[in-house]
Every structure is written in C-alpha cells, then in structure tokens.
Amino acid sequence: MASVLQALPARTRPTEVAGEVARYFGAVSILLVGAVHAQQYYGAYFSVVPTIGTLFLLSFVGSGVVGTVLLAPVRRLGRNAGDLILVLAALGAIGIAVGSLASLLVSEYMPLFGFMESGYRLAIVLALLFDALTTVFLGLFVLIVARNHAAQPPITTERKAR
C-alpha cells in the first residue's frame, strides 16, 4: 500500500484518489443507464410508445455524452477548467439518473404520459440500480471537488510594483 501511495504525485491526497474513483465509477454507471434505455428503446420496442420512447432515446444519447465527458482527460485543459467541465457533466448525469429514477417510480403507481409500468423485470431493476449508483458516485465526486476547491488559497492577480 505504501508503494502505491509513493507512486502518486506529492500533491495527490487520498480524497483526490477517492474523487477520481467515484468519477470513473459514476461514468460507467451513467453509461449503463444509457445502455439499459437503448436496449429498451430498440430491443423492447419502446420506440413506438409516444413520448416515453423519445425520452428513452434522449436518456441514451444524454447518458452517452456525459459519460464520455466524465471519462475524457479534460483536466489537460487546466485543473480549474477541467474540474468545471467534469462537475457540469456530473451534475448532468445526476439529473438524468434522478429524472429516470423518479419517472420509473412514478410510472409504477400511476400512468406517466399515458404509460404505466407493472412489476420489476430485469431492465427495471438494472435501471434503478444504475440510477442510484450514478447519483451516489457522482454526488460524492462533486462534493470532493467542491471541498478541494474550497480548501485552495484564492488566486490573486495583483502585480508587484517595480
């Protein structure tokens, strides 16, 4: 364990490592949310269900976009710019996951856009699981990034008098 920590850059702290792990797990989770919606759209023929089919397709596309951004090396643009992009992508992913989760739970008890789910088949269980994992992992990532930025000293732009 000590050798792994020694291999990390000196400024890397355990919370930063936890943040990166949460980021990558969250990225995989939101991509899996998209995969479930794509399978349901194409394989289970939800494409023919008005409104719901369109929402499944949008969830698939949106999940793919934010998941890809979360996996991309955007911190090469600079630490602050990279963190901003990653936090915005994480918040987008959380929005997709929470929206999907809420919609699924509502449609279990009452019609949503004229459609009502019944029972907990595998696709529903997987969607619930991946929505929850996305929310937890990326919520943790956002909190860690916010905490790390709050702990940094402010950047000053004052020029020294010559």
Model-derived features: positions:
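Membrane-interface extramembranous regions
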Residues: 2-162
